[in-house]
């Protein structure tokens, strides 16, 4: 059994001639790691701006990983900044929530695309992670989706027993059927959210912001959204 887990531009998938459909979000993702003055308290934070979405994701200690989904004009500007200017921009865009920031890794940018993979399997082949799907990072679900792929593939193989053929077509079809619905739902959700948050219609923007404020004010609703994301 060959497992393709080699990213959104998967060489394994291409060699297997598995069809892919994709479209560009006309945005770039800019990633970097920072050390923070204040504790992140293991909370992932996002800020929605007219020209992009900034996310700071907690790492160990006082480290965070930044993902800034920016339109092409904004990403070009950010890529031209010095290290000190990048820190200042992120501090301002995050409302100084984590205090002073220090850049730990050089910012890297990449184009953001929606990638739909027609089949998750081939002859003695299974795709997992970004090789099996490519979604917008705004919901922070790409890693979770890939981990669920891996968990389902492993559990499907284990359930068949030690003496079974792990590359058996029917076994791989069982894995594919089990994962398709969740992947399609996440692709639809992230695509819809991206369209919602990139829309600059004033009325829609006000309604969207009101929805975020109300969600933040109701802990039970937030917990349910978190649980849904984890499951």
How would you name each of these model-derived features?
Residues 155-231:
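C-terminal helical "tail/cap" subdomain of flavin- and related membrane-associated enzymes
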Residues 22, 58, 145, 181-185:
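A generic short alpha-helical patch detector that favors 3-5-residue windows
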Residues 14-15, 138, 157, 203:
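Short, function-defining helix-loop hinge/capping sites that tune catalysis or transport
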Residues 9, 27, 147-150, 179, ...:
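Short amphipathic alpha-helical/adjacent loop interface patches that line ligand
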Residues 1-107:
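Conserved FAD-binding catalytic core of PHBH/FMO-like flavoproteins
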Residues 74-169:
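FAD/FMN-dependent oxidoreductases across multiple families
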């Amino acid at each position: 059994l060959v497992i393709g887990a080699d990213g959104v531009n998967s060489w394994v998938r291409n060699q297997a001639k598995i069809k892919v459909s994709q479209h560009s979000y006309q945005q770039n993702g800019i990633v970097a790691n920072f050390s923070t003055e204040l504790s992140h308290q293991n909370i992932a934070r996002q800020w929605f701006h007219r020209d992009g979405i900034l996310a700071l994701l907690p790492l160990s200690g006082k480290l965070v990983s930044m993902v800034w989904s920016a339109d092409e004009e904004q990403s070009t500007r950010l890529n031209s900044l010095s290290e000190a200017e990048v820190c200042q921009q992120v501090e301002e865009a995050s409302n100084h929530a984590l205090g002073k920031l220090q850049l730990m890794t050089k910012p890297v940018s990449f184009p953001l695309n929606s990638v739909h993979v027609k089949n998750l399997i081939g002859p003695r082949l299974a795709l997992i992670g970004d090789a099996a799907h490519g979604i917008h990072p705004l919901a922070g679900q790409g890693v979770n989706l890939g981990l669920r792929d891996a968990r389902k593939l492993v559990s499907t193989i284990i359930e068949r027993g030690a003496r079974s053929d792990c590359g058996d077509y029917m076994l791989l079809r069982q894995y594919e059927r089990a994962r398709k619905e969740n992947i399609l739902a996440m692709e639809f959700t992230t695509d819809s959210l991206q369209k919602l948050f990139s829309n600059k219609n004033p009325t829609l923007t006000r309604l969207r912001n009101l929805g975020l404020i109300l969600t933040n004010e109701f802990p039970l609703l937030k917990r349910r959204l978190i649980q849904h994301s984890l499951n």
